């Protein structure tokens, strides 16, 4: 009985070894290699990768796009952005003296990029941020501009902000937004177009002002004086 168990165990052991070696040989000879020999080889990062935030430059003028508006520093949830600036006495514009990001505490949340109104920040693809000295993880203005050159381009001079170039919601409120205005807003936000004839549903606090504005427009079209706010034309004339 003991001899039988010995040969049985030996057979199962040999079979498992041969099976394992067969899998290893098949993976080695007939499957593509997935090992990356870093740092000689590097995989491409996906487009949505978030690396160190860097500053972009207008390659047409050679000037950096940052205006020191402080929006990114205010949006940062961990306060890793430091901005120092002074005002040019001639142009009255802000001039950036220092723009630093402490990458030892940055959480790569992308809030600074989303908050920037001038598209001067971008999340770069640089991921090799290991440093021996933690103080070297503070990237200064020149470092961020140098790293951001690969993401910069020559900007065409655009027109000044006008009624047509500014997002529609800046000029149109809920009470006077037309159907075309609402469609423009949805197109600006990348949303699908609304069905034809769509009308916005006003909140209760906006309904009465909207009704009064509509009555005033109708009265003006009919050649009648507009009623005072809170009164209809009938109440103004003394009718019950």
From Swiss-Prot:
<dbReference type="GO" id="GO:0048038">
    <property type="term" value="F:quinone binding"/>
</dbReference>
<keyword id="KW-0874">Quinone</keyword>
<keyword id="KW-0411">Iron-sulfur</keyword>
<dbReference type="GO" id="GO:0050136">
    <property type="term" value="F:NADH:ubiquinone reductase (non-electrogenic) activity"/>
</dbReference>
<feature type="binding site">
    <location>
        <position position="76"/>
    </location>
    <ligand>
        <name>[4Fe-4S] cluster 2</name>
    </ligand>
</feature>
<dbReference type="GO" id="GO:0051539">
    <property type="term" value="F:4 iron, 4 sulfur cluster binding"/>
</dbReference>
<dbReference type="InterPro" id="IPR010226">
    <property type="entry name" value="NADH_quinone_OxRdtase_chainI"/>
</dbReference>
<feature type="compositionally biased region" description="Basic and acidic residues">
    <location>
        <begin position="198"/>
        <end position="211"/>
    </location>
</feature>
<comment type="subunit">
    <text>NDH-1 is composed of 14 different subunits. Subunits NuoA, H, J, K, L, M, N constitute the membrane sector of the complex.</text>
</comment>
<dbReference type="GO" id="GO:0005886">
    <property type="term" value="C:plasma membrane"/>
</dbReference>
<keyword id="KW-0677">Repeat</keyword>
<feature type="domain" description="4Fe-4S ferredoxin-type 1">
    <location>
        <begin position="57"/>
        <end position="86"/>
    </location>
</feature>
<feature type="domain" description="4Fe-4S ferredoxin-type 2">
    <location>
        <begin position="97"/>
        <end position="126"/>
    </location>
</feature>
<keyword id="KW-0408">Iron</keyword>
<feature type="binding site">
    <location>
        <position position="69"/>
    </location>
    <ligand>
        <name>[4Fe-4S] cluster 1</name>
    </ligand>
</feature>
<keyword id="KW-0004">4Fe-4S</keyword>
<dbReference type="GO" id="GO:0005506">
    <property type="term" value="F:iron ion binding"/>
</dbReference>
<keyword id="KW-1003">Cell membrane</keyword>
<dbReference type="InterPro" id="IPR017900">
    <property type="entry name" value="4Fe4S_Fe_S_CS"/>
</dbReference>
<dbReference type="Pfam" id="PF12838">
    <property type="entry name" value="Fer4_7"/>
</dbReference>
<feature type="compositionally biased region" description="Low complexity">
    <location>
        <begin position="215"/>
        <end position="230"/>
    </location>
</feature>
<dbReference type="InterPro" id="IPR017896">
    <property type="entry name" value="4Fe4S_Fe-S-bd"/>
</dbReference>
<comment type="similarity">
    <text>Belongs to the complex I 23 kDa subunit family.</text>
</comment>
<protein>
    <recommendedName>
        <fullName>NADH-quinone oxidoreductase subunit I 2</fullName>
        <ecNumber>7.1.1.-</ecNumber>
    </recommendedName>
</protein>
<keyword id="KW-0479">Metal-binding</keyword>
<feature type="region of interest" description="Disordered">
    <location>
        <begin position="185"/>
        <end position="240"/>
    </location>
</feature>
<feature type="binding site">
    <location>
        <position position="72"/>
    </location>
    <ligand>
        <name>[4Fe-4S] cluster 1</name>
    </ligand>
</feature>
<feature type="binding site">
    <location>
        <position position="112"/>
    </location>
    <ligand>
        <name>[4Fe-4S] cluster 2</name>
    </ligand>
</feature>
<feature type="binding site">
    <location>
        <position position="106"/>
    </location>
    <ligand>
        <name>[4Fe-4S] cluster 2</name>
    </ligand>
</feature>
<comment type="function">
    <text>NDH-1 shuttles electrons from NADH, via FMN and iron-sulfur (Fe-S) centers, to quinones in the respiratory chain. The immediate electron acceptor for the enzyme in this species is believed to be ubiquinone. Couples the redox reaction to proton translocation (for every two electrons transferred, four hydrogen ions are translocated across the cytoplasmic membrane), and thus conserves the redox energy in a proton gradient.</text>
</comment>
<feature type="binding site">
    <location>
        <position position="116"/>
    </location>
    <ligand>
        <name>[4Fe-4S] cluster 1</name>
    </ligand>
</feature>
<keyword id="KW-0830">Ubiquinone</keyword>
<feature type="binding site">
    <location>
        <position position="109"/>
    </location>
    <ligand>
        <name>[4Fe-4S] cluster 2</name>
    </ligand>
</feature>
<keyword id="KW-0520">NAD</keyword>
<keyword id="KW-1278">Translocase</keyword>
<keyword id="KW-0472">Membrane</keyword>
<feature type="binding site">
    <location>
        <position position="66"/>
    </location>
    <ligand>
        <name>[4Fe-4S] cluster 1</name>
    </ligand>
</feature>
